[in-house]
Structure formats: C-alpha cells, structure tokens
Amino acid sequence: MLGTDRCVVEEWLSEFKALPDTQITSYAATLHRKKTLVPALYKVIQDSNNELLEPVCHQLFELYRSSEVRLKRFTLQFLPELMWVYLRLTVSRDRQSNGCIEALLLGIYNLEIADKDGNNKVLSFTIPSLSKPSIYHEPSTIGSMALTEGALCQHDLIRVVYSDLHPQRETFTAQNRFEVLSFLMLCYNSAIVYMPASSYQSLCRMGSRVCVSGFPRQHEKHWKELCGRIVLDPEFMVQLLTGVYYAMYNGQWDLGQEVLDDIIYRAQLELFSQPLLVANAMKNSLPFDAPDSTQEGQKVLKVEVTPTVPRISRTAITTASIRRHRWRREGAEGVNGGEESVNLNDADEGFSSGASLSSQPIGTKPSSSSQRGSLRKVATGRSAKDKETASAIKSSESPRDSVVRKQYVQQPTDLSVDSVELTPMKKHLSLPAGQVVPKINSLSLIRTASASSSKSFDYVNGSQASTSIGVGTEGGTNLAANNANRYSTVSLQEDRLGQAGEGKELLSPGAPLTKQSRSPSFNMQLISQV
C-alpha cells in the first residue's frame, strides 16, 4: 500500500469521527466526489494483514447504521470484495485476520433483518397479475377469462408472498454461513442500480474466484494468489447470477461473460440444477455483440418489447380442421389432374362404380368433392397400365374394329365426372340363388357403356374379336363384343356356374341398375346424357 493511499484512508477515518450530526447529509452528498478514496479502501480490504483493516471495517459499519441512505449504499459497494476476502480466509483457516470482516458482515445482516424497534422484518414479494399486460407478456395469449363475480372481485387483487423470518446471528458457522451471505447478496442486488462501475468489477472478480478456486481451471486465470476449494451453495450462486446479469449490460460485458462461464463450470461439477437453469438461460439470451454503452448513466436492462403481431398462431388444431385441410389438398390435386382419364379403383380395394343418374333422387349430387378428388388421384396411377392394355388390344383388332371403336369413343362427349359415384361393395361377391350370368355374346349395350376394371387381367381370349354396331330409335349406340372381353378373377369363377340364362330379358334404357342387374365384377357405369 502506497503512502498516498494510506494518507487518504486516515484522513477519511478522522473526518467522519469529527463530523456533527447536522452535517451528515451534506457529507453523504460529497462523499462520491472523492475519487481516490474508493481505490484506497479496496487495497486495505484486500490486504488482510493491513493494520487499517479493522478501523475501516468499523467505519463502514457506522456508515451503514446511519439514517442516511447514500451512506448505506457507500458501504454496500464493498460487499462483494468483503465476501471474497472472508471466504478466502475461511478456507485458509486464518481466524485472527478474518474477525473484523466477519463482524462487519454479521452487523449488516442483523441490521437488515430487523426494523427500528428490533422486530424481525418480513420480506414481501408482489406477484404481478397475468391478466394485465406488461413488457413480458400479452394477456390475450392466456385466453379469455370468464366474466364472473369471482373474477371481478379478484381483478384488482394484489397477491403478496412473504418470506420466512431470518433469525439473528452472532457468529458464522458451517450451517448458517451461506444463509447469511445469500441474504447479503439479496440486499446488494436490491441496490445494484446505485452501485458504481468499480463495484460491478469487484462482483465479477469475486464470482470467478469463488467458483474456480481449487479446480484445474484456476491455473488458467491470471491471479497472483492461489486459494483452496470453496464450498458454495446453489441459492448463493443464483443471487450471484442476478447481480452478474445486471453488470453485463452496464459496462462489464467481458468480465460478465467470463464469470458466467465460470459459474456454469462450477454448477456442472456440483450438479446444481438451479444455477444451471438460470446461467444457461442467461447465456442463450445474450446478444452477439456487446450492448451499446455510449450513453452515460444508463442503469436499465434492454428488454425486447412484446410485438403487436403475435408470432405464434393461436388457431386450435382439431379433427375438423385436419379434415378440411385434407379436402382442400385433394381438391387442389384434382384440379391439376382434371384433364386425365377417369378409371375405377382396383377391385381388391372393395369399391364399385355402379352409379346411375336414374337411381339417384332428383336434386341430389351423384358424387361429392372428396370422391371426385379420389377418382382423379386414382387416374394418375393407372394411366400407364391402361395404355399398355389398350395397345395390346389394338394389336389384336382388325381395321374395321378400330374404326368402330373410334366411333364409339367419340359418341359420349358430354360425360363428366359428376355422373360417377363410388359405392362400397364387398371384395368377394357371390351370386344369389337362381341368379345366372348372362352370356357375353347376347350382351347389347343400349345407352350405357360398361367399362370393366380389375387389378388382374389374367385371361384374354386369343380369338378374333367381332364387333357389331346398332343404332336405336333414340340415337343410342349398341355394342356387342364377342371373345374380345377381358375377364377378372371373379368373372372367370362365375362363368363356370353355367350359362342357363342366355335368353333372359335385358335392361330397358330407362330402368335403374339393381343388385341383380349389375355385373358381379367391379364395374363403372358411364351414363351418356342426351
């Protein structure tokens, strides 16, 4: 300690002792102007063998017990450095040099837990109402509250939480050491906005040293003195993080990041969940660059104001909304594939297209939007297979058959997907009693074109196909196919039952299709509208 610093400290000690009570207020207003006093006091506190340490601790306690608030804050700025020296001396078991600092810490603690009458204080914490807006949340995100009599009664109710009573302590023990130090850190954090920059630096240095002392990370620091391992408490580390978080945004960005990493390092080794939770939340919320410290006297944290536009959609996801989304997607896919041919689903999937306009009530739509979307989706998957089948049939047809087929295909120009309906049927159909399959040679289609669709086209008759065309009185086209039809597996099994009903009367043009009149295979009825 230099002679000039010693003279400054001795002058400060003698000045306050001779100060009358009427001048304490003016003395407190001019105390912060002594720029050389604070660094000199730090040097006295750091040197445990200094003879001025005991009178300095006594003088700091007298300032704290005075009625002037600014004198209390002057003593509080040295609190982090006093804690570090106390913990370092406790580990080294130097009880003689530690007595005055221990008495000062206990004196501040006992003054804070009691009021003027000597009764223990009860600390109160106000819980803000979530129904009122703040810079941290929007009340609309919570949901609408029911306007009841109970809600109206509790609208302006302020909820207050009270802490337990803190007993007075006469000495430090291993059981109550960090209980006292945690409470002292709480008092320091409550007045941290009034602390100078030197106090923030002392807080960061104290946090790094108490966390890494006695661990391998200590050798990476540029400290002159080495210290043993210091036992820490999770609550004390959380209070330490509270002060460090404020110091980082008020001029101590580099020191704050260093102590934050050291606290995380120690909390991971000790498996302290609460300090880990707070420290990781602080680290993840830090900006990439240091905050703007050009504005002098800035004593607030920069907090992002809640945006006016909500960032998270509050639309409830229900079964109905998922169904509507699926229908919209199928409708969009159906519009893209609207020009493609319409084919029926596979026979093994259990769907049949026995739809007829005459079999439906007047005023009802024969198909829904979802069914049309399904038909268009099926059409894209089966177009390649149908092209191969059509090319195989073309190769076996005569020139005349091809001309006839072209004329037949060009006939129903007014067909639309709206005249097609899917109706669920069973996979395996059985003929009812007395029902026979009409012979294929006697089939004549009047105004209805029956297109058989099946997954397995296993059997194709190799004989030459003959086709005849007959035009009815109403302009309908009749097509008779001989030995050129494609049979499904179900059709081949039913053909073995016998051909007893060859002369059975066929359907009339206007008669609706019934279960007996439909083909047992899965077919799709395309109705031409005149």
UniProtKB/Swiss-Prot annotation:
The keyword Cell membrane applies. The modification Phosphoserine is found at S321, S341, S430, S442, S444, S491. GO terms for biological process: phosphatidylinositol phosphate biosynthetic process; protein localization to plasma membrane. It holds the Pfam family Hyccin. The modification Phosphothreonine is found at T30, T306. The gene is HYCC2. One of its GO terms (cellular component) is cytosol. Its main location: cytoplasm. The keyword tRNA-binding does not apply. It is found in: Cytoplasm, Cytosol; Cell membrane. This is Hyccin 2. Belongs to the Hyccin family. Component of a phosphatidylinositol 4-kinase (PI4K) complex, composed of PI4KA, EFR3 (EFR3A or EFR3B), TTC7 (TTC7A or TTC7B) and HYCC (HYCC1 or HYCC2). Residues 353-373, 514-530 have a biased composition (Polar residues). Component of a complex required to localize phosphatidylinositol 4-kinase (PI4K) to the plasma membrane. Residues 328-410, 502-530 are annotated as: Disordered.
